[in-house]
From Swiss-Prot:
It comes from Pectobacterium carotovorum subsp. carotovorum (Erwinia carotovora subsp. carotovora). NCBIfam families: GspF (TIGR02120). One of its GO terms (biological process) is protein secretion by the type II secretion system. Disulfide bonds: none annotated. The keyword Heme does not apply. Signal peptide: none annotated. Ca(2+) binds at E99, N153, D157. Type II secretion system is composed of four main components: the outer membrane complex, the inner membrane complex, the cytoplasmic secretion ATPase and the periplasm-spanning pseudopilus. Homodimer. Interacts with OutE and OutL components. This is Type II secretion system protein F. It is found in: Cell inner membrane.
Length: 408
């Protein structure tokens, strides 16, 4: 998309100048007329071509819309479409309404594609960094069925639910993370600064030190001598782990082991199955074909092993296996969810049963997160208290011994 300098007459007949983004001079004139201007001259700004090209590239690949921004844009667009406003005008209104420049530019670019004759879904597919496959598939289904406003409202609900879930997880993790950092910092300062100064006095007295004090001195020396190297080793290990996870086989193997951990595995399985069921419910309610809906729903899974198992379930459904049987073969879904899906298949209300199953799984996920954090926080506090108590006792024991010797 290029930039064009223009001279035009406004509604009062006054001359005005400015720039207009468009794919061609003809489109620039058309956009100016839609703004109520009479174009006198439209010249391409060639000095900005390279900049414009890089902007287009960033729109296509680099911009990542937050779920809150995406939900807001979708809700605004759904409201305008439901009010029978033409799609081009609705997109223009959303672009002008946005206070964030990159969002306004994105919606203007989508509008430009629509005005070229593309469908809304195809226009959004041109910007995969901003609109994921699930979003584009639902918009396409809404355009085909003639219920675009209802589908957009459903999409807005979906993105808002995702944002709420992410916010709940982030808020739940704030306190344990802060507590962990504080605990590590306190113990590190005690071992590297406080303990050496106190123990130094005992060494000058040439007194036989108890075992706990000698252990504490060894720990303190290790922290001061090898502390930086230990940090470097941890950083190197973390980077090596990240590199290892880039290999698909090892990543799938790690994700498979993750799902089998006692408590973390249940939480990860609950989060992924709830996300899959909710996505499949929305796609099915939007008249997306089941196989396509299953493929897209599998793509939203954060666990690669679960994604692989669900791709096998999609193949099984393609071969004629019922949905609940195919999902049972994955060994990911709890029995209650499978029974609800089977009931939905028999009654013809699969989308509503999938939504109820996702709601149940969300509640179970929340309870599991609460349990995990409820166990972690007191364990961390007790562990920190035990370490501090050991340090205090290791310092007090020589002092008590010295007092005993002096009194005797």
């Amino acid at each position: 998309m290029a930039q064009y300098h223009y001279q035009a007459l406004d509604a009062q007949g006054k001359k005005c100048r400015g720039t207009q983004e468009a794919d061609s001079a003809r489109q620039a004139r058309q956009l100016l007329r839609e703004r109520g201007l009479v174009p006198l001259s439209v010249d391409e700004n060639r000095g900005d071509q390279q900049k414009s090209g890089s902007t287009g590239l960033s729109l296509r690949r680099k911009i990542r819309l937050s779920t809150s921004d995406l939900a807001l844009l979708t809700r605004q667009l759904a409201t305008l479409v439901a009010a029978s406003m033409p799609l081009e005008e609705a997109l223009d209104a959303v672009a002008k309404q946005s206070e964030k420049p990159h969002l306004s530019q994105l919606m203007a670019a989508v509008r430009s594609k629509v005005m070229e004759g593309h469908s809304l879904a195809d226009a959004m597919k041109c910007f995969p960094g901003s609109f994921e496959r699930l979003y584009c598939a639902m918009v396409a289904a809404g355009e085909t069925s003639g219920h675009l406003d209802a589908v957009l409202n459903r999409l807005a609900d979906y993105t808002e639910q995702r944002q709420q879930m992410r916010s709940r997880i982030q808020q739940a993790m704030i306190y344990p993370c802060v507590l962990t950092v504080v605990a590590i910092a306190v113990v590190s300062i005690l071992l590297s600064v406080v303990v050496p100064k106190v123990v130094e006095q005992f060494i000058h007295m040439k007194q036989a030190l108890p075992l706990s004090t000698r252990v504490l001195m060894g720990m303190s020396d290790a922290v001061r001598t090898f502390g930086p190297w230990m940090l470097l080793a941890l950083l190197a290990g973390f980077m090596a782990f990240r590199v290892m996870l880039r290999q698909e086989k090892r990543r799938v193997s790690f994700h498979r082991r993750l799902l089998h951990l006692p408590l973390i595995g249940r939480i990860a399985r609950g989060l992924n199955t709830a996300r899959y069921a909710r996505t499949l419910s929305i796609l099915n309610a939007s008249a997306v074909p089941l196989l396509q809906a299953m493929r897209i729903s599998g793509d939203v899974m954060s666990n690669d092993y679960a994604r692989h198992r669900l791709s096998l379930a999609t193949d099984a459904v393609r071969e004629g296996v019922s949905l609940h049987k195919a999902l049972e073969q994955t060994a990911l879904f709890p029995p209650m969810m499978r029974h609800m899906i089977a009931s939905g298949e028999r009654s013809g209300e699969l989308d509503s049963m999938l939504e109820r199953a996702a709601d149940n799984q969300d509640r179970e996920f929340s309870s599991q997160m609460t349990l995990a954090l409820g166990l972690f926080e007191p364990l961390l506090v007790v562990s920190m208290a035990a370490v501090v108590l050991f340090i205090v006792l290791a310092i007090l024991q020589p002092i008590l011994q010295l007092n005993t010797l002096m009194s005797s």
